[in-house]
Amino acid sequence: MIKSELVQIIASRNPHLFQRDVENIVGAVFDEITNALAEGNRVELRGFGAFSVKNRPARSGRNPRTGETVDVEEKWVPFFKTGKELRDRLNGAV
């Protein structure tokens, strides 16, 4: 599912909302999650999961095409840990 499909599903299940309003709401939610992560904060959605950022330290890598050793810089990457309710639902427990 892509963002536009998510918007369409939410709009169809909530006929009292205009699709453009749903687009704005979904966009605002994603923007706030992104902003919080960019500030180094954790975003927890109870029952669904938690978004956080993890540090990947600098390391030596290898160019697969040439075999040349390259230095890979330190970077921060997004991380998502599923919540118990989501895991249970995916595994048929609910």
UniProtKB/Swiss-Prot annotation:
SMART domains per UniProt: BHL
Keyword presence, Transcription regulation: yes
Task performed by this protein: This protein is one of the two subunits of integration host factor, a specific DNA-binding protein that functions in genetic recombination as well as in transcriptional and translational control.
Name of protein: Integration host factor subunit beta
Family label: Belongs to the bacterial histone-like protein family.
GO CC annotations, alphabetized: chromosome; cytosol
Keywords associated with the record: DNA recombination, DNA-binding, Transcription, Transcription regulation, Translation regulation
PROSITE patterns: HISTONE_LIKE
Pfam families per record: Bac_DNA_binding
Record-level Gene Ontology MF annotations: DNA binding; structural constituent of chromatin
Assembly and oligomerization: Heterodimer of an alpha and a beta chain.
InterPro entries in alphabetical order: Hist_DNA-bd, Histone-like_DNA-bd_CS, IHF-like_DNA-bd_dom_sf, IHF_beta
Gene for this chain: ihfB
Alphabetical list of Gene3D superfamilies matching this protein: IHF-like DNA-binding proteins
GO biological process entries: DNA recombination; regulation of DNA-templated transcription; regulation of translation
